[in-house]
Amino acid sequence: MDVRRRPVKPLYPSEHISSGEPLKPHNQDSSVKASDALPLPLYLTNGLFFTMFFSVMYFLLHRWREKIRNGIPLHVLNFSELVAMVSLIASVIYLLGFFGIGFVQSFVSKGNNDSWDVEDESPEQFIDRTVTPPPVRRNIPMKSVPVAEKTAQIITPFSSEDDEVVIKSVVEGRIPSYSLESKLGDCKRAAFIRKEALQRSSGKSLEGLPLDGFDYESILGQCCEMPIGYIQIPVGIAGPLLLNGKEFSVPMATTEGCLVASTNRGCKAIYVSGGATSVLFRDAMTRAPVVRFGSAKRAAELKFFVEDPMNFETLSVVFNKSSRFARLQNIQCAIAGKNLYMRFSCSTGDAMGMNMVSKGVQNVLDYLQNEYPDMDIIGISGNYCSDKKPAAVNWIEGRGKSVVCEAIIKEDVVKKVLKTEVATLVELNMLKNLTGSAMAGALGGFNAHASNIVSAVYLATGQDPAQNIESSHCITMMEAVNDGKDLHISVTMPSIEVGTVGGGTQLASQSACLNLLGVKGANREAPGSNARLLATIVAGSVLAGELSLMSAISAGQLVKSHMKYNRSCKDVTK
């Protein structure tokens, strides 16, 4: 769905909502116009002055050319030339007054219009803002309105005392709830009216859903449609996480008790052991359209064409036109009968990149359509990408950022901080995360709770929480090193999908959390480095979470800690 910011449209007077009287569009106003005072019809008057303007201009130019040839001063005028000058000035004044003022007004109004697609709306919705709306008549019985007339009924710009009228109009279906922002010009007020209308129509209370304290303008056309408030998720801090020689305080938005505390303990164990090291070894967002041919042979021919290195440069140029940050890396094809799936991989700078890669894919599809006119484009996404679902292609080939993070935990730290033994941790990891996950038929789930940490960091930093599915693909490895005294732990995460620009990253709270990590916005000196750093921080946080939870399980502390920190004593039914 294409959601864009639309212009604020004034509405017709609210008294017509109560009375049920149909209104004439503003452009059908029957008021007296200045042109009514002209002695001739308007089209004849315009024609007269047009003819006068061009005639006298031709006459004067002809006379001036003769004066120049004969050496006569131009300012010396005879009677006919004087009459021509007066006629020229009169015609210019008339034409400028008739056409020029309207042009200037339209130019100024366009310059002040904060919209992208004014032409999308009907001109019948516009009225003169200088007209003061009449007072709203209360307690007047509603008249039945024919269906054909309902579409023309809308109300004037509302003042604060008119909220009740608007709410009733929304409840009764005369004002679409989705149009409140564009009609009112106040996003917060639109959210309030929508929320109140929903409570009345559903009969359910939304008292606990807050409305104040949020910038609804910031989500218009970008993050959420038809808002009625916002939810509150506590944000905790784990750390410092010592990663690649730098310290990070990791924000985690969660409602699960123990999660932040456990991750914080893991960060402490890593810190006192000398820190963790992470490496990003792949960076490529993917999109895989599906196309169909009349035969499998033709599908195979396109596969050979796309995968031919001789054609890759041409396809790259076409693809990279979509953005100055998009750079096509490779195209991987798969055939199913006469259907072809093409998995495009590209770097996307500091953006997560789904929109960017989709635009590039569309460019290539348009190009291929000319080369293969019998190609039928079924969909720009054929699930071979694969987005927001567990898939072996992501686990094997990766999607987004692929990161490995490791640390060596000292023996005394394992005993004093984690309250367990190295050998116990290694055995538990093998039987739980490896063998147990294999028995369950897990796909990318060879870990204890990577999704817990990924979800919490994603919510705090404005990432797409639905991409937690593939981003949480992780295999946790543990091994005794240094003669069995110390613990080597690592997490390998092939598809961390993050960005530091776009989407929810521009919201105030999420932007503050990104700023805390030092990755807010785009990195102009090294495009893409902020998003890559965020991916390594996610992996480092997962490493800390895995280390602490596995230690709690091996020491038999899991149930005890959750009974202490993860139980609610509040009766939510009251």
Swiss-Prot record:
Highest rank taxon of the organism: Eukaryota
Ranges where the record places region Linker: 104-161
Protein keywords: Endoplasmic reticulum, Glycoprotein, Isoprene biosynthesis, Membrane, NADP, Oxidoreductase, Transmembrane, Transmembrane helix
GO biological process, one term: coenzyme A metabolic process
Transmembrane stretches, start-end: 41-61, 83-103
Enzyme class: oxidoreductase
UniProt-annotated location(s): Endoplasmic reticulum membrane
Gene Ontology molecular-function annotations: hydroxymethylglutaryl-CoA reductase (NADPH) activity
Location of region: Disordered: 1-30
GO CC entries: endoplasmic reticulum membrane; peroxisomal membrane
Its membrane topology: Multi-pass membrane protein
Name by which UniProt lists this protein: 3-hydroxy-3-methylglutaryl-coenzyme A reductase 3
Species for this entry: Solanum tuberosum (Potato)
Protein encoded by which gene: HMG3
